[in-house]
Amino acid sequence: ADMGMNIAGGAYNFGYNTGDAGGHSRVESGSGSSVAGSYSYVDANGDRRTVQYTAGPGGYQASGDVGVDRRTAAAAAALAAMAPKAPIPAPAAAPAAPWYNPVPVAPAIMAHPGGYIAKW
């Protein structure tokens, strides 16, 4: 693996290259609030993918191999088509209309069945 770095006066640059089967590499430089660089790698299909980027007050902008790999996407779409589909839920029934059911209440005072008898 190769690596280099330089920092001076608020600016920097660095880079590395792994040199392995994954072929990872990256270079970047920046000054103040702006950064520019690129990275690359070898994807699962054996293709080298390279992305260039800049970042600063306007946000992050990438170009190059930033899209989906067409071969991988086609295989993924075929597999997704075979996957079981989620059931479509039945529409929920509307709630029942409110209704009123009065409950009979015993009176608070009841007459005695034998009448009232006063004893003095």
UniProtKB/Swiss-Prot annotation:
Any matching Pfam family: Chitin_bind_4
Entry keyword set: Cuticle
Gene Ontology CC terms: chitin-based extracellular matrix
GO MF terms, alphabetically ordered: structural constituent of chitin-based larval cuticle
InterPro entries in the record: CHIT_BIND_RR_consensus (IPR031311), Cuticle_Struct_Prot (IPR050468), Insect_cuticle (IPR000618)
Ranges where the Chitin-binding type R&R domain occurs: 9-87
Function: Component of the rigid cuticle of the spider.
PANTHER family, alphabetized: CUTICLE PROTEIN (PTHR10380), CUTICULAR PROTEIN 47EF, ISOFORM C-RELATED (PTHR10380:SF173)
Protein name in UniProt: Adult-specific rigid cuticular protein 11.9
